[in-house]
Amino acid sequence: VSAPHFDLGQGEEGRVFVYLGSTHGLSTMGADYILQLPQAGAHFGHSVASAGDVNGDGCSDILIGAPEYDNGQEDEGAVFVYFGSPGGLVTSSYWSAESDDAGSRYGSSVASAGDVNGDGFSDVIVGAPEYYYGSGSIVLYYGSANGLGSSTSLIGSHEDFGYCVSSAGDVNGDGYSDIIV
């Protein structure tokens, strides 16, 4: 559950609440994990999704976008993956990537892509609808035994390409997952 405008004292840093299922359903006592990014205006949690199992350890991972994250450029955006484990969510470390384009709003949309290349690992899609003066782009990161690694970028020629991203399942029945942008 995301609260991208959650104020931790700096203004709209954002917060994500993770609730674990059990034989009794979800806990009503509060979130099992609370994730946050201590940067004013980052809007951590603007987009959230299951990443699938990007590292093949048998546990689902979590994908979180912060489209107004700044690291040298205003609103370049970032995406974060927290890894699941048999002991629960690993919060002490995470994988992250960010845009190289000011104002791109990278991480505005995030989704599991399924297994696009058929290697047995889940892949993820990240949208940056304002990349390159609003043309937009998506980045597809491929899962591996080491987590997310190599990537493929598609740059749009249309306004806000990457505004929404999703897995499409296997549209043509060839055994590979497809995506929707």
Residue ranges, per PLM feature:
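Conserved beta-strand/short-helix segments
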Residues: 1-181
